[in-house]
């Protein structure tokens, strides 16, 4: 029987033979489970096509398929469900409908606009279901069948991908013929196929969840084991380093103590003669403290040797010292008691030094204690001597250099320029030159210079200006403006000029950069180091640079 031409590219007389139903169902499931989106970020969950024609064997499969609640896909359309794998919306499902022309629609609104634009009357937006069914809609009675089919598909992912390509090519090229004498409608066959694919999809998802949980548990166990192993190795390394360093310290301390004891053997006879009852009491207190705090017998023997002074006990302490060295290599408990031993050593030094306050203590005893414990303790006399720094002593202040004075500068006579500046006249008296800069500050020369001569006639020196009344000075400076402020500035400047030790006049009250530059150019031979900002000083400064060779200026 010839199949009708339904818009495909086949020849009109070509016959189409339908595939067996079980093979096509497998291919549909493979497409639903193995497909990944083109961008690699979406997982194709299911892909449903409407079979244009219904197989006669569909009735036999209807009893083994799970029923779903969504409508079948319209004729020629394809329904694709994708799950997002990444991003903030990972796990969300997207439903697409692909038209026979290849157009993709993601929402019911865009689909309705498309149908309205093309004038479609047979199809309605309600025929397309964009919802994803919940998990509970699948009948659990058929799980064993879908699980068996799924396990047969899982081992070979390459076979699945090949089957996907085959099914897609078949969908694009093949059109199934309409069977004659079928009792079921196309809707029931589409429902059965979609139900079986969805059932297998649910089982595949459950298996993937179980596998992911197992992998997470195994990773956690591995990380915990790695962390514990690394912590153990770190602790072992730290312990070994501490043991090695403390062994070396113990060796050095034992050797030094034995050497000091050997040097002090000849002095023991003198100590036995000079020891007094008070020293005996001190020995008893030292021995009690050693018995209470010292964990090892070697230290007790050492303190008995210090207090007794007999040669037999010295040999016993030497043997105890050797035993102590052997114990440091074998026992780790003595390493922990290192800090306690140091505290005991300081305690014994304090007791022996405090023995000097007793009435009948000898100088030999003091010498002995200072030699044996000079490494562990610092004498108090050395700390008490240097209470103040040498910098603050009077001797240091006398020897220190005083700040440079104005007399250290070499005076010179600045050459006369064609600009006729007032500084060229007053260079011989720095005070008058600086007073002129105060007058010329923010004031033109035509106004300031006549008032300046009047002021210098009335107040010819800094001593006179220092003792003047600021009201009289302000009356004189009224034509210049800011007369009160300038009068007070002149009086204070004159006082600091006489009393303050200054190097440059910018350190004085009321003198700025203009006055400082004028002083360095005209009073001191530092015109080469100055960069003036005043326009008159700039002219004079440039003139000096242009003519310094003719004027033989250094």
Swiss-Prot record:
InterPro entries tied to this protein: DNA-bd_dom_sf, DNA_glycosylase, MBD4, MeCP2/MBD4, Methyl_CpG_DNA-bd
GO terms for cellular component: chromatin; cytoplasm; nucleus
SMART domains according to UniProt: MBD (SM00391)
Positions of the MBD domain: 63-135
UniProt region (Disordered), positions on chain: 1-23, 154-195, 209-252
Biased composition (Low complexity): 178-195
Enzyme Commission number(s) of this protein: 3.2.2.-
Principal subcellular localization: nucleus
UniProt superkingdom: Eukaryota
Active-site residues annotated for this sequence: 534
Compartment annotation: Nucleus
Example of a GO MF term: DNA binding
Biased composition (Polar residues): 154-164
Modified residue annotations for Phosphoserine: 296, 402
Pfam family of the protein (one): MBD
Cystine crosslinks: none
UniProt keyword list: DNA damage, DNA repair, DNA-binding, Hydrolase, Nucleus, Phosphoprotein
Any one of the GO BP annotations: mitotic G2 DNA damage checkpoint signaling
Assembly mode: Interacts with MLH1.
Biological function: Mismatch-specific DNA N-glycosylase involved in DNA repair. Has thymine glycosylase activity and is specific for G:T mismatches within methylated and unmethylated CpG sites. Can also remove uracil or 5-fluorouracil in G:U mismatches. Has no lyase activity. Was first identified as methyl-CpG-binding protein.
Protein's recorded name: Methyl-CpG-binding domain protein 4
Organism: Mus musculus (Mouse)
Lineage of the species this protein comes from: Eukaryota, Metazoa, Chordata, Craniata, Vertebrata
